[in-house]
């Protein structure tokens, strides 16, 4: 679907012809604002890559010539967040003739014309299947002085073939599939991203190799349901084979993936995780509910016994695995007995982290039409009980890490109190967030380097390592750290000593894997 809709006129100016050649027009700047999941974060990298390929440059501050919103449609507050942001930009655009606003992603795929009706100052709306159209839509909107709406109903080109500006030089997202064949009643994503489409293994491995050649030492394999990878070309063990193939890539030190589905999580994947050294001892396994009745209503096609059995198998093969999950509270028809079943499964599962959500009614999903929608007060009370339980479990599980020696990959992001504590931050192999200090006289690591430290403090959402002396601190400078040095030198226009593989400019803006804190929704 492609529509052209009149938009507010952008100011233009003309100047008298002179004998001197006009100065070159300054490059237009851009900013991409991302809402939602890791898939959206990676899509935003593609949007940035395409804009830079078209001659745009990143905005140095808040003011940009082009602002792109990459949206989420999973929860109601995603709508509110988008339209709130668009409302705040309306006067900014009115005061800056030539500024453009574009909206893409899942909410754009869903709302389509509604976005232009609610925010007629938007210049371009595009969906999940035509991310590559963004630069052309912006150009067309400027040329025609009309808003452009283009939504495709199926994938135009697999997005990983598009230019990409990586947010991190030491870690990278790699899509192995897009879309989903499941029919969970609460989820609108399959309707917006379509049926599952798989990349060929050779294409995936080539992209990973290119990332490693540029200095990355960590990748996260992305898909709506990664362990169903291979369904398009008829190989039920394709995902486990892909994990093992990642283990053959020299220089690739950490492999993660998100997210799998319990119904199709098979023993060959667990074996590949356990037997491939660079596949990290970390698993995100969405539970959603511990009640078999609610799981049936959700059309999740597994039950609590199967879920707990998967965790048992993983921990048997990978004893130190950290397991995280997603849980929805207040699904229509959830009784107190159903909720207690969820609490029981959470207690048994001993999750390192749980991302807990209050059910949000989404038009267009089967669950939105179910009877027995729960009162807000009931959902809130259950949510608070669940988060209190999980916070206790997380603190207990982290306390078990005290005294352990862990290898931490240093990230560009620091903790909120880093200026006070002078600690740096990073992720352990099992994806726990670790804040650590560098002993006096020891060499300071760069983002992408690896340090080995002993855990000295534990809290529910992070660990602390304060080495008593330099003898309790080990630094391994990495190719990823070299890549970070080069990227910083490139951004400053300064030379840097060589080391490691070829350069891939960028900044360390995105931490891979799951967020550090559970998502709190009120």
Swiss-Prot record:
Compositional bias (Gly residues): 496-511
Residues the record lists as binding [4Fe-4S] cluster 1: 37, 72, 106
A Pfam family that the UniProt record links to this protein: UPF0004
Binding of [4Fe-4S] cluster 2, residues: 180, 184, 187
MTTase N-terminal domain location: 28-143
One GO MF term attached to the UniProt entry: 4 iron, 4 sulfur cluster binding
Subcellular location: Cytoplasm
Domain Radical SAM core stretches: 166-396
Annotated keywords: 4Fe-4S, Cytoplasm, Iron, Iron-sulfur, Metal-binding, S-adenosyl-L-methionine, Transferase, tRNA processing
Main location: cytoplasm
Keyword check for Secreted: no
PANTHER family given in the database record: CDK5 REGULATORY SUBUNIT-ASSOCIATED PROTEIN 1 (PTHR43020), MITOCHONDRIAL TRNA METHYLTHIOTRANSFERASE CDK5RAP1 (PTHR43020:SF2)
HAMAP family according to UniProt: tRNA_metthiotr_MiaB
General function of this protein: Catalyzes the methylthiolation of N6-(dimethylallyl)adenosine (i(6)A), leading to the formation of 2-methylthio-N6-(dimethylallyl)adenosine (ms(2)i(6)A) at position 37 in tRNAs that read codons beginning with uridine.
Protein name (record): tRNA-2-methylthio-N(6)-dimethylallyladenosine synthase
Species whose genome carries this gene: Arthrobacter sp. (strain FB24)
